Amino acid sequence: RCKWYGYQYSEILRSLMCVYLCGGSCVEDVTTHLMRHLSLHPSLRTCSADTILRAIEELTCQNTTYQSASGRVYDFNTADKMNSLLVNALLATGQLKAGQEYDFDFDHQFIETEKYDAKPTYKKFLGYSPGVAVIGDVIVGIENRDGNTNVRFNQKETLERIFKRLEASGVHVARARMDCGSCSEEIVGMVEAHCKHFYIRANRCSSLYD
């Protein structure tokens, strides 16, 4: 955030976490119930619920709609601002260090939800299927997708954005690991360009046994 803003993201995130760590159930509790107590802390600058919600809105990203070769339409959300803040926060807290190399894992997770835009997944429930990148036990990138999206559809672009964001922050991937949902020529070629070694499980097919 611009330094001329009243609160930085670090202060806003601390205020948001205080809601849940102090027994609150919604963001508004920070103003109505917790502010008078949190204000006694000598170094914690606690912001109002309105400020927290405005900051969250600043980080939102409009969906991008893609059309497949077969004519089907899928919504993606790249969450660029949120992902950039995520990487910066991991660097600021020392969970990632610039100049070091890490092992990188990527997979799609299926999240069940009853939201209005949820789509049927192959797991037989409505939801989303975000692509999630992890280093160790911390998430370093996440992009949401419709639940009915084929796992390989535009996966190359998703991975490339995540790799480039990490590289721009000085974080490099030594080894990348993915399951057979990433086993395609274009995805393998892109992954190879951004890491020293990669492990991608091959699809089961008759040619493997020939």
Predicted regions and their residues:
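Active-site-proximal, Lys/Arg-enriched surface segment
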Residues: 45, 56-132
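Basic, short loop/linker segments at the boundary and entry of helix-turn-helix/winged-helix-like folds
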Residues: 1-14, 153
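Catalytic or ion-translocation cores adjacent to nucleophile or general acid/base/metal-coordination motifs
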Residues: 144, 153, 192-210
